[in-house]
C-alpha cells in the first residue's frame, strides 16, 4: 500500500511524492524419507523482507516545446533470510545464504522532452543508481528521437543503458571455504545497452498498430567461474556459489501491439 501527495507550485510546475511499502514472507521445507520412513531434511528456507519506498518527482513545463522531469527514488530494504541445504541425502544441512540487516537502493534521474518542430521530437536524460550494501553505482544515459511523418504514421529510434541489482539472497551466499563471509556481497549491477526501433500507425480514430524491433546487449552479468551458470538462466529459487561479473548476453525480438480504445 501507499499514499501520494501532489503540490502545484504554479500551472507549469508539479511536485509529486509517493510513500509505499511492501512485505514478503517465504518459507520452504523439503524432506526426503527412506524406506523406513525416516526423515532426512534437504532444504530449509526462511526469508522475510520489508521495503519502504519513497519516490518524488518534479515536473516542469518550460514552454510549449520543452518539459523537464527530475526524480528521486529511495528504497530501504530490511531483510532476514536463512537458507540451509543438504549437499547429499542423509547429510546434515549446511548454510548456503544468510543475512539479517538493511540496505538502501537510491535512484535519481533527469529527463527532458523537446519538440524540435512539428515533426521531430527528442527525449533525453540521465539515470543513476547507488546500492549502499557495497557502494556500487552506475550512470545510464538514455535518448529517443521520434519522427511524425503525418497524422497517422511515426517512426522512432531509442537507445538506453539499464542496470539492475540481484535478489538479496545472492549477495549473502556463503561457502564451506569462506566460512561466515558472504562471497557475493561486492557484486556489481548487471548492465545492458538497449536499442529499439519503432513504427506506429493509426489505423482509425480508435485503433492503432505499433511494431518495435529491439536488441539488448548485456554485460557485467554475474556468472560462476568455469561453469555455464549465469543469473540470466537461473531456474532455481536459490544460488549457492560464488559469482563474478564476467558474463555477457544478448536478447532480441519484435514487439507487436494492436490497441483499440473502447467507447
For the regions a protein language model found, what residue spans apply to each?
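Extended non-membrane alpha-helical scaffolds
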Residues: 196, 201-205
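Surface-exposed extracellular loop regions of Gram-negative outer-membrane beta-barrel proteins
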Residues: 25-27, 83-85, 132, 152-195, ...
Amino acid at each position: 500500500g501507499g499514499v501520494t501527495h501532489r503540490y502545484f507550485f504554479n500551472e507549469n510546475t508539479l511536485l509529486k511524492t509517493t510513500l509505499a511499502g511492501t512485505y514478503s514472507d517465504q518459507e520452504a521445507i523439503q524432506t526426503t524419507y527412506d524406506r523406513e520412513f525416516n526423515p532426512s531434511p534437504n532444504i530449509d528456507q526462511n526469508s522475510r523482507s520489508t521495503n519502504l519506498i519513497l519516490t518524488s518527482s518534479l515536473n516542469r513545463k518550460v514552454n510549449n516545446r520543452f518539459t523537464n522531469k527530475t526524480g528521486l527514488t529511495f528504497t530501504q530494504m530490511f531483510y532476514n533470510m536463512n537458507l540451509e541445504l543438504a549437499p547429499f541425502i542423509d547429510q546434515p544441512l549446511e548454510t548456503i545464504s544468510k543475512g539479517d540487516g538493511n540496505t538502501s537502493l537510491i535512484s535519481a534521474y533527469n529527463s527532458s522532452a523537446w519538440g524540435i518542430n512539428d515533426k521531430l521530437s527528442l527525449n533525453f536524460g540521465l539515470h543513476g543508481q547507488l546500492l549502499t550494501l557495497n557502494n556500487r553505482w552506475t550512470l545510464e544515459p538514455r535518448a529517443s528521437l521520434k519522427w511524425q511523418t503525418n497524422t497517422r504514421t511515426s517512426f522512432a529510434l531509442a537507445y538506453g543503458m539499464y542496470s539492475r541489482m540481484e535478489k538479496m539472497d545472492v549477495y549473502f551466499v556463503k561457502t564451506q571455504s569462506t566460512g561466515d563471509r558472504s562471497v557475493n556481497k561486492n557484486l556489481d549491477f548487471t548492465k545492458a545497452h538497449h536499442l529499439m526501433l519503432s513504427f506506429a500507425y493509426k489505423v482509425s480514430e480508435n485503433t492503432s498498430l505499433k511494431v518495435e524491433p529491439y536488441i539488448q546487449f548485456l554485460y557485467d552479468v554475474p556468472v560462476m567461474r568455469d561453469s555455464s551458470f549465469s543469473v540470466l538462466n537461473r531456474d532455481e529459487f536459490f544460488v549457492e556459489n560464488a559469482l563474478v561479473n564476467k558474463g555477457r548476453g544478448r536478447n532480441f525480438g519484435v514487439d507487436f501491439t494492436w490497441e483499440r480504445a473502447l467507447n
